[in-house]
Amino acid sequence: MYIYFYLIPVFIILFFSVLVTNKIIKISIPNVQYPEIDGLRGYLAFFVFLHHCFIWEVYRKTNEWKPPSSNLFNHFGETSVVFFFMITAFLFISKLLNTKQSFDWAYYIKSRFFRLFPAYIVTALTVVFIAFYNTNFNLNTNYSETIKSLVSWIFFTINGPLNFNSFQNTYIINAGVAWTLPYEWIFYLLLPFIGLFMRIKASLKVLAVFGLLLSIIIYFNGISIKHMYAFLFGILVAFMIHKYPSNSILSSNKISIFGLLLLIISVYYFNSGRKFIPLLFSAFIFLIIVYRNSFFNILSSNFSRKFGQITYSLYLIHGLVLFITFNHIIGVEKLKDYSMLHYWLLVSVLVVPTVVISQLSFKYIELPMINKVKKKIIYGYQPRSSQRI
């Protein structure tokens, strides 16, 4: 129970870290159609960070990397990913629903690649380097195994987060966060097939290429239906918003309180955010957020939206910060002697470099590519406003 009190300094330092970082490393906030979604994203990524901090807290003592025994900390990971998947499905299905012209599928898939790849490849190569460093830069596997694991890490771990150069549990270096990316790609590649049911045309060439890539990912990565339910709920929300664009009742403070109550029930009674009832609760909460419920103006605030911009980098980078600190700066053996209070105070301190590095990554890796892609080609549809995705 005391562990929940340790979160207080974590969130206090987060607040000041985001404020100060945005004063020093300035990034403008774009006009978007759903600012509440942008505001939500940053918190989701930070909850994933806390999820992995709890896992590390157990791992340092037991050497077992396993889901948190705490309902809250398990929801920090699982429910946050559920929301990420719903956001992806909602935004892209909404774009299809708002399409009045032909959809440029070639640009769509290229833009997705260049949106995800730059920040990812930097972190993936960092994982590879750390694994190589921890094996004393000696090649411990044959060339074919080395290339196989390297290729898997480069291409979003579609063949799994393979151990690199015989470094056991290589995935722990980045806290295993890459597993969600193949599922993102599965949805991206399913989109033209979904579009057919919405009378959005796609050529046979597009369907063949997308179908081939989809088959390759599913063949190597596999697919768990339980992870696809979140995308389905995101699709349903998109159709509902398209048919009923506004709902003042769902954006009220009373509904905000009701939404928080659902979250509390979900966390208290369920250990997993992937079970049907927690999924249903999450879908309802996401629905009211899309209906401009900002939860007492928190999600639509400039603070939340600035924090939300670094979501992807924060998601990818936090595991590296934890691993480098715990393994190479402090040392796992010394970390074992930390009391729980000492450990969570250390986590509080690590919030600062995590936010700063994520801000730098967004500004100098993600944002230039986002702007470059936008300048080169214009989407084959005219969205009502630009939603950065």
For the regions a protein language model found, what residue spans apply to each?
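Transmembrane alpha-helical segments and their boundary/interface "anchor" motifs
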Residues: 41-44, 74, 78-81, 96-132, ...
